């Protein structure tokens, strides 16, 4: 049975860092469920403007007095330990007043109470797979509540309080917070070592997925992509615990590489421009393969969709309706998102600029593979990768792997490291990545000059893709503008 009644401690909350992707989503749901919300953040943003329009009281900057934005003060203060230091004056004041300080994952878990919970995790593809599942269920008339790490194209938001009986959310593995949840269905897209700054070792990182799956509700199921070795190993360990496992992938004859039957098989996949058509087969169905159409390119996207399909079917959604919903999925912001074009109308006479959140070597490889297929189908042109490493610790750990992944482009520009919450590490910079790239590469430590230099390298038919989890996303529009300026003045080197 679902209810809109909020737990007493969440009826009036103050949120420190309210503008972040995860925090703003929680704020939306609390407001939609009748809660009173105040908050603070370091700077204005579109998300903060949207929350104010919904009734949230938000102050820019951090000060102890912000806890008085709500009449009577908050019943709880919500924060995220990854981004907000314990010395934040609002957190210090909350502790002084005896106001409970609750971390975002614990709040999300409380908001899921009473609903069938579907959660997606994995090293890569979490946000896209979660969003695909949401869109599919919406198309089936389920109106799920949801919280996702990126802005969905269809909804224009990252969270929603729905009238349905299910809740779909992304489970972030980066800091172990996924262990707050007890899902009915867990989707694991892949497992590949990451976030060593938090876990310290690959074994510790892998272990958190086992712990998460062991938290499945009684009768729950693991939906897992066994094309990925790490996820396939998790599937075997989970099955040994007696937990139901639904495997998907592209193994021959409907079997995983290790011989287990697949619940869903990607029989074939073909990219058609920026769209794709896949042939899939579900276990126990002997008819011809089903057709799955997608509006997003890349084989990895087809596998993500297959995981979303299985999860939706698991809670009773009709297969054909789910496939129809997936066909209408428009993507997630910053997941191979077309930023703009410059030049003529035909692919051979224009430069297309895309932006992607890829910040791990495997994600870069998948994105550049999609670019390569796009170029092959449009008659040629070159791929130009613009990569901004994210976190000094990750750059140090994967500098060589980043370089090898970027070799799939024809030309590469490497920006300096976006440190986010980390302090610089001696000897670690964008140059650490660039020195491992074997195709033509330039290291651009001056972000302000990058757009013009990238634009100068482009020619008609080329595809430029900016990649990274930092502010490299701001560069795409600047590149498009620079390309158009060069075209209008007939500058050599671009759109010639």
UniProtKB/Swiss-Prot annotation:
Enzyme class: ligase
Binding locations of ATP: 122-128
Pfam families noted in UniProt: Mur_ligase, Mur_ligase_C, Mur_ligase_M
Entry GO terms, CC: cytoplasm
Pathway as given in its UniProt record: Cell wall biogenesis; peptidoglycan biosynthesis
EC numbers for this chain: 6.3.2.8
Catalytic activity: UDP-N-acetyl-alpha-D-muramate + L-alanine + ATP = UDP-N-acetyl-alpha-D-muramoyl-L-alanine + ADP + phosphate + H(+)
HAMAP family: MurC
Family: Belongs to the MurCDEF family.
Stated name of the protein: UDP-N-acetylmuramate--L-alanine ligase
Gene: murC
